[in-house]
């Protein structure tokens, strides 16, 4: 019996798990490195808790296999990495408010900038801390999100250089359509970015790191590599869409699994799940219950649509996905018992299949795996 004061690992033996293969992460990074060459920097994007895989563990695997630096969305994510002892350069992609500038400085991050107010705040906080903060100017070449108009880049860069406690480390932009087979707009964006870089050079403004390539850029647009690439989804072994090339062979790193928790036989005419949206038509239908639902990141839109794998065989989901449980028809599989493993996605059942059934992308599925699901690293 556990006694007071002892640490209890409640996650140990948890039925529903996300199994993360760090060897696959390392292999994917190595493949990206081979693709881009040794002369360019590789920034591993580990925002959203490493796309749901675990930012700290993914970061360590990436850095051990050829990544030079990391990227997060917000300073809080960078702080978590610093607390874990990760000391490499970390860029925060998100545009923070001036009142949050202290977070970037405190966590020793590099910060995306495209507003004078944020520049002033970063300069002030850096001066207070007695440090210099690296910044990367974001240029909007067609994403329509954050970033300066290209024609404002030179003036803004001059303002950065006038801030005594800031260092212009990089200038970058982001593709909006590079994961589509038609690269016309991506090439338009690339042209705008090149002209912006040319204007900065003509103005005598040095830019140490120029970067634009996301995962789709790495795969399909080598002319966008510049000084550094920023792969995200492909680190995790997933392609950004079905329209990109497979110029880098990738191994999916995550498998989402659970175990059967209950099995029973029911007669024809038995309603299954909330709303009674499924009613059995055969006698002696064997129904297995699994302890995973939409709170774990298994979308409710999979109700009456998805299949899972039990003992190597695909079986259908019966009825609605509930918050914590789902039911399966395992009649075709002999002797299914509580404790038998179930694959929700992974080998033999790609996450893209799940995403397609609910009308979304693989990114959303893996980043949506719930926080109560332990990540198990192999």
Cite the ranges covered by each PLM segment.
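Active-site-proximal beta-alpha core segment in soluble small-molecule metabolic enzymes
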Residues: 4-12, 16-20, 24-27, 40-211
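Active-site anion/phosphate-binding pocket segments in diverse small-molecule metabolic enzymes
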Residues: 1-22, 26, 30, 34, ...
